Design a protein with these regions (language model features):
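Active-site-adjacent structural elements that line small-molecule/cofactor binding pockets in enzymes
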Residues: 1-155
Length: 155
């Protein structure tokens, strides 16, 4: 799921997967891990800002959901859940993103200029995921924008 962090993936998700696989006599070689993929990038500062706003709102939406509280807890951010949940019930969707600070954004998303996205993904997840799912908001940059990023990641 996109609502994860490197810390949660390494400390919770992967150990649970490994334990489940071991119970069934399998190993991680028998399983494909698809990494969380919030990405904040864009061709210019304005596009990056739009992308950050969109991803902050998406993080806030997920953080308001009780099912994802564990992801917040591992970082000590569980107190935010109640505020976001109450705001969601009041329909304050746009304002919810304002509660997601830079530290949280950086934990949940790869925030990088286009030519650095692949390197950042590799640094965070290269040793523990087999594939990445990109979840980017803030503008449709099209295939011409994403093709070099994907090619760099595949290289």
């Amino acid at each position: 799921h996109a609502f994860s962090t490197e810390t949660y993936l390494r400390e919770v998700t992967l150990p649970r997967i490994e334990a489940g696989l071991a119970k069934s006599g399998r190993t991680m070689d028998d399983f494909e891990i698809i990494g969380p993929g919030f990405v904040v990038t864009g061709p210019d500062e304005e596009a990056m800002a739009r992308a950050a706003t969109g991803i902050r709102q998406q993080i806030a939406f997920y953080a308001s959901t009780p099912a994802y509280l564990g992801v917040l807890e591992i970082h000590g951010w569980e107190g935010l859940h109640g505020d976001l949940n109450a705001m969601s019930k009041r329909g304050e969707w746009q304002a919810m993103g304002d509660l997601i600070d830079d530290e949280m954004l950086d934990a949940f998303a790869v925030v990088a200029e286009p030519d650095k996205v692949a390197a950042e993904i590799r640094a965070r997840y290269g040793d523990c995921v087999d594939r990445m799912m990109f979840y980017a908001l803030g503008g449709d940059h099209g295939a011409d924008f994403w093709t070099p990023i994907v090619a760099d990641l595949a290289a």
